[in-house]
C-alpha cells in the first residue's frame, strides 16, 4: 500500500495508466548507467510494463500518460477529443512522486511517459520537460526514462528534453501518408518526420562530440563489427566516467567555468543554486542555459543515449505487409531508428469507418512483422527480399525466414562445413549465436547433426536446407510445396515420404501422405 501517495493521485494513476496501454514500450533500455553514489536509480540495471536491458535482463517501467486530455480527434485513439471519457492530468510533481515511490519499493526500474495534447504540442512538451527536469535534479532519479516526442513541438524543447531522457520516440502512427490522413486528420506526415530528423542529428552530433561514431552501423550481421562496436561502447563509457570525475574535481576547486570553456565551448556555466524559471528546483554542477533561462544540457550527458524509436499501427488501414516493412526499412536506413514497433489495431472506439469491429486484433500479423524486422536488423535481409509487389503478405503458417528459404531453393542445401557467415545466417533454424558456434567449432572437427543440435540449431527447420559433410539428415525432396507442408506440420521427412509425381498443397494431410510406395 502506497500510504505516502494521496487517493487523488492514485485515481489519476488508475485512469492514465489504463489510457497508456496501447502505446508500445517493450524496448531495451540501450543505455548502461550505474549508480554514482549521489543520485537514485540506474538505467542499466497499476501501469507497470516490462522492458529489456542491453544484457537481456527484464526490467519494469512505470508506463503512464501525463494527461488523457487531447485536442486531436484520431479515430483509433481512446483519448480522442470527441470521446466522452473522464479527463485527468498529472502535475510534474505528481509524476515525480509516483516514480520515486514506486522505485523505492522496487516496483519499477524506469519510467515510460507519454501524453495527450494539452493546448498545443509545445505547451505539452514543456510540461514533460519540467517533469523530467524535476525528476532528475530535485529527486536525483538516475534510472531509465523513455519519453514520447510530440510532433509540432519546437526544436528547442526537443533539445532540452533529449539531455534528460534515455530514449525518445515519435510515433509514425500509420505506414503511409494517405492512411494517416484517413484516420488522424489533425496530423501530417511532415510534422512527424521533422522531429525524427532533429533527434537523429542530435544523437549523431552528441556521439561525435564525445568521440564516438554515429549510430548508423547498428546491424550486427558481422561478428567482427559486433565486437568492435561493443569495445567502442565500453571505451566511451570509461572516458565519460573519467570526464565526469574530472569535472567534479574541478568544481570542488572552483575551476569548473574554466574547464567547461576549454573542454566544451558551450555557453556560460551556472553557479550552484541558480533557480530554473519554470520550477522551484535549484540546479547547477554542469547545467547550461539558453536565453529563456531553461537548462539545456550537461556536457557529461549524451543526447538521447538509448536512441530513438517509432511505432506503426497494423491493420487500421489497408497497407500490406510489404508496405509496412518497406517503411520500417526506410526508418532504419534514413533515420537511424533503434527500433520500429508494430501495434496490432484494436478498434477501441467502435468506429464503423475502421476495421476490426467484433474481430480480434491481428496479433499473428504483428508477430510476423516483428520476425521480419529482426531479419532486417540482425540477419542482413532487405524488405524486397522478404516480400515483393507480387507477394505482399507473410505466410500465416511459417515464419518469414522459412518463407524466404522455400521460395529460394536454388540457394540450398548449404554445406555446414564450408558456408560463410552470411550464408549460414539465412538458413532457417540457425541464429546468430549458433552461426558463431558453428564457425568456431568446425575449425577443429567435422560437425554432425547431433553437434548442431547441441549448438542451438533448430533441426526441425534447418534439416531441409543443410548438409553435414555432404549428406542431408534425411532423404529430403527439394520441392517448395513438399517442404512447406513438412514445416507446417513439423513431421519428420522419413515418416512422410510422398510419391514423386504427387502434387503437394498446403491443405490438411491425408492418410495417403503417410504411405510410401
List the predicted regions and their residue ranges.
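Flexible, acidic/Gly-rich N-terminal and inter-domain linker regions that tether
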Residues: 1-69, 458, 466, 474-504, ...
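A glycine-rich phosphate-binding loop feature that marks nucleotide/adenosyl-phosphate handling sites
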Residues: 32-34, 214-221, 345-350, 385-401
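Conserved, mostly hydrophobic/aromatic
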Residues: 61, 74, 113, 170, ...
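Canonical Radical SAM [4Fe-4S] cluster-binding loop centered on the CxxxCxxC motif
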Residues: 64-93
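Conserved AdoMet/S-adenosylmethionine-binding subsite of the radical SAM
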Residues: 96, 119-381
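Short Fe-S-cluster ligation motifs
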Residues: 100-114, 372
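Long, highly charged, low-complexity intrinsically disordered interaction regions
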Residues: 353-425, 461-517
Amino acid at each position: 500500500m502506497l500510504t505516502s501517495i494521496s487517493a487523488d493521485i492514485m485515481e489519476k494513476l488508475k485512469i492514465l495508466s489504463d489510457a497508456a496501454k496501447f502505446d508500445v514500450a517493450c524496448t531495451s533500455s540501450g543505455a548502461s548507467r550505474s549508480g554514482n553514489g549521489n543520485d537514485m536509480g540506474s538505467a542499466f540495471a497499476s501501469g507497470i510494463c516490462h522492458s529489456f536491458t542491453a544484457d537481456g535482463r527484464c526490467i519494469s517501467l512505470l508506463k503512464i500518460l501525463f494527461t488523457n486530455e487531447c485536442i486531436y480527434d484520431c479515430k483509433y485513439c481512446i483519448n480522442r477529443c470527441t470521446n466522452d471519457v473522464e479527463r485527468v492530468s498529472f502535475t510534474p510533481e505528481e509524476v515525480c512522486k509516483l516514480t520515486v515511490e514506486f522505485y523505492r519499493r522496487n516496483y519499477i526500474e524506469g519510467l515510460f511517459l507519454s501524453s495527450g495534447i494539452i493546448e498545443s504540442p509545445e505547451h505539452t512538451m514543456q510540461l514533460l520537460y519540467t517533469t523530467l527536469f524535476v525528476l532528475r535534479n530535485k529527486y536525483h532519479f538516475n534510472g531509465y526514462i523513455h519519453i514520447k516526442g510530440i510532433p509540432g513541438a519546437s526544436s528547442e524543447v526537443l533539445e532540452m528534453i533529449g539531455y534528460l531522457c534515455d530514449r525518445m520516440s515519435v510515433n509514425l502512427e500509420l505506414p503511409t501518408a494517405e492512411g494517416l490522413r484517413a484516420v488522424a486528420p489533425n496530423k501530417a506526415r511532415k510534422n512527424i518526420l521533422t522531429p525524427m530528423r532533429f533527434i537523429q542529428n542530435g544523437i549523431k552530433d552528441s556521439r561525435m562530440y564525445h568521440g564516438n561514431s554515429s549510430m548508423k552501423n547498428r546491424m550486427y550481421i558481422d561478428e567482427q563489427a559486433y565486437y568492435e562496436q561493443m569495445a567502442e561502447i565500453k571505451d566511451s563509457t570509461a572516458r565519460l566516467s573519467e570526464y565526469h570525475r574530472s569535472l567534479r574535481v574541478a568544481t570542488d576547486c572552483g575551476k569548473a567555468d574554466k574547464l567547461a570553456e576549454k573542454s566544451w565551448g558551450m555557453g556560460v556555466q551556472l553557479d550552484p543554486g541558480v533557480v530554473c524559471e519554470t520550477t522551484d528546483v535549484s540546479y547547477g554542477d554542469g547545467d547550461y542555459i539558453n536565453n529563456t533561462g531553461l537548462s539545456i544540457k550537461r556536457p557529461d550527458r549524451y543526447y538521447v543515449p538509448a536512441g530513438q524509436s517509432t511505432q506503426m499501427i497494423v491493420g487500421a488501414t489497408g497497407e500490406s505487409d510489404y508496405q509496412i516493412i518497406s517503411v520500417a526499412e526506410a526508418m532504419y536506413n534514413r533515420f537511424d531508428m533503434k527500433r520500429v514497433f508494430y501495434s496490432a489495431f484494436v478498434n477501441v472506439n467502435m468506429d464503423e469507418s475502421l476495421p476490426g469491429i467484433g474481430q480480434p486484433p491481428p496479433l499473428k500479423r504483428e508477430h510476423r512483422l516483428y520476425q521480419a524486422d529482426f531479419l532486417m536488423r540482425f540477419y542482413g535481409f532487405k524488405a524486397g527480399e522478404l516480400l515483393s509487389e507480387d507477394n505482399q503478405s507473410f505466410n500465416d503458417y511459417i515464419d518469414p525466414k522459412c518463407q524466404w528459404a522455400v521460395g529460394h531453393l536454388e540457394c540450398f542445401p548449404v554445406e555446414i562445413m564450408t558456408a560463410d557467415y552470411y550464408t549460414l545466417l539465412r538458413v532457417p533454424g540457425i541464429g546468430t549465436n549458433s552461426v558463431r558456434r558453428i564457425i568456431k567449432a568446425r575449425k577443429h572437427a567435422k560437425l554432425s547433426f547431433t553437434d548442431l543440435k547441441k549448438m542451438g540449431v533448430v533441426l526441425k527447420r534447418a534439416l531441409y536446407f543443410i548438409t553435414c559433410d555432404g549428406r542431408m539428415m534425411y532423404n529430403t525432396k527439394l520441392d517448395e510445396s513438399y517442404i512447406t507442408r513438412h514445416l507446417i506440420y513439423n513431421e519428420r521427412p522419413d515418416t512422410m515420404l510422398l510419391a514423386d509425381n504427387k502434387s503437394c498443397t498446403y491443405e490438411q494431410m491425408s492418410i495417403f501422405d503417410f504411405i510410401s510406395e
